[in-house]
Swiss-Prot record:
Gene: yopC
Organism this protein belongs to: Bacillus subtilis (strain 168)
Job of this protein: May be the toxic component of a type II toxin-antitoxin (TA) system. Neutralized by its cognate antitoxin YopB.
Stated family: In the C-terminal section; belongs to the MbcT/ParT/Res family.
Assembly with partners or alone: Forms a complex with cognate antitoxin YopB.
This protein's name: Putative toxin YopC
Keywords: Toxin-antitoxin system
Recorded superkingdom: Bacteria
Length: 442
């Protein structure tokens, strides 16, 4: 008997009994054990999450917990199983097809799987038609671009974003949400050099008088300055291709204006599952979780997070949609959006412990000048003096480099090490504390 039927049976049996007998508890515990993603339960006496190893039949002695388990199993588990199995990112290109044909196959399979989901409170299957239309606009955009009709390609993309905006509340995707950042209002940027010593200005975007050296990036076109930041020094290092740390300089960026809006495309299947686990019991009966918007948004996220197949090529078709998206963001509602947050395509395995480490931010310049940097971005961020790796090494055992307490990034990919205790984690602590020490001395 599958989990759905077991949960239905538990719900039916529960309605027949005024008291919760042992057979109901055992059935509930069996369901809990079989769940791939399990809801969290709170100990009412301590307000702490009950560890999975402590959950047993007696955990399900009250009706509310049984109701939570039933609701999770019927409404949430099938959706989360689909998201974890079918919404993986980044997309890995296989075969020899052009990108438009490849993504058409990806979306066809995705839509077919959506049709298999039951129509319940958490998912309205009537929305699949709109999701499919949006996917078709994305593949048509890529097709037109590859055929050389760039202006028609953007027009098609704009039509697709109109469909998207009708179905998804853009405001709900807006990040400035501290939950996505380990330390409020702090971002990181890293550069490499064997000879040059960098200043604060060097850590900002490439100045306008040097725009000729700007190459194509995932979210920006050649010649257009864009500030790329990371949620951790680790993701900055990964994006640079894991260079020799002895050649690196790192700065911390402090956001001065908390009201800026950034389009958040960084919600991974792992993050979604993690948040649901944490908040489902707290919001039970007060909030109905609906996944239509996420299924629509995944079309856009996946189109922006296709791993580059040929790194050495000058033209990268995988950048077509993300570059169009940044242009759309700049044009939308008088450019009220400042940039885009997205997951790094460098990560191979997302876990509940590490997904917040691998977030990138692409923030385009907002005012063009003959030389120098964008004044508006300059007013928005306060940049620390860059710290060379060698400088950090001479201070890594000092109080300024002690791990920051209560980190939100406890684990790094492929390891079971606490990130805040790693050298890169301690570098971040040093950058933050070192800046404070210098500021106090001024």
């Amino acid at each position: 008997m599958d989990l759905y039927r077991k949960a239905k049976r538990l719900k039916k049996e529960l309605s027949k009994h005024e008291e919760i007998n042992d057979s109901l508890k055992e059935l509930a515990f069996d369901i809990f054990k079989e769940l791939t993603v399990k809801p969290e339960f709170i100990d009412k006496n301590t307000n702490d999450v009950i560890g999975e190893e402590k959950i047993n039949t007696s955990t399900f002695s009250n009706k509310e917990r049984l109701d939570i388990l039933i609701e999770w199993t019927i409404e949430i588990d099938p959706i989360l199983s689909f998201i974890i199995d079918k919404c993986d990112i980044p997309i890995e290109r296989t075969g020899g097809d052009d990108l438009d044909a490849f993504m058409e196959n990806v979306y066809t399979e995705y839509i077919e799987e959506l049709h298999k989901l039951p129509n319940r409170k958490s998912f309205d299957s009537s929305k699949i038609t709109k999701i499919e239309s949006f996917a078709q606009q994305i593949t048509k955009t890529i097709e037109l671009y590859l055929d050389g009709y760039v202006h028609l390609a953007y027009a098609e993309f704009d039509k697709g974003m109109n469909i998207f905006s009708e179905e998804v509340n853009i405001e709900e995707l807006l990040l400035y949400n501290i939950d996505s950042i380990r330390i409020p209002c702090k971002f990181f940027r890293m550069r490499t050099s064997n000879t040059e010593v960098f200043s604060k200005d060097d850590m900002f975007h490439i100045p306008f008088e040097k725009r000729g050296i700007i190459r194509t990036n995932r979210f920006s076109i050649p010649g257009f300055p864009c500030l790329y930041l990371g949620s951790s020094s680790l993701v900055c290092w990964e994006e640079l291709g894991r260079p020799d740390l002895n050649t690196t300089y790192t700065s911390v960026f402090h956001l001065e204006d908390e009201d800026i809006k950034i389009l958040d495309l960084s919600v991974s299947p792992t993050e979604l599952a993690d948040n649901l686990k944490k908040f489902f019991e707290i919001t039970f009966r007060r909030k109905i979780y609906k996944f239509n918007a996420y299924f629509m948004t995944w079309i856009l996220i996946s189109a922006c997070l296709i791993r580059v197949k040929k790194q050495k090529d000058i033209f990268k078709p995988e950048y077509i949609i993300p570059q169009f998206l940044l242009e759309w963001v700049k044009q939308t509602e008088s450019s009220e959006y400042w940039g885009i947050c997205y997951l790094s395509s460098k990560i191979n395995r997302q876990t509940i412990e590490n997904y917040k480490l691998y977030k990138n931010y692409a923030i385009p310049v907002r005012q063009r000048k003959d030389s120098g940097h964008c004044s508006l971005l300059g007013e928005t961020f306060q940049i620390s003096d860059p710290v060379a790796w060698e400088t950090f090494q001479s201070h890594k055992d000092s109080p300024e480099s002690l791990p920051i307490k209560n980190p939100l990034f406890p684990e790094t990919e492929g390891t079971h090490h606490d990130y805040h205790k790693t050298e890169l984690g301690r570098l971040e602590a040093f950058l933050i504390r070192y800046r404070s020490v210098v500021k106090d001395q001024l």
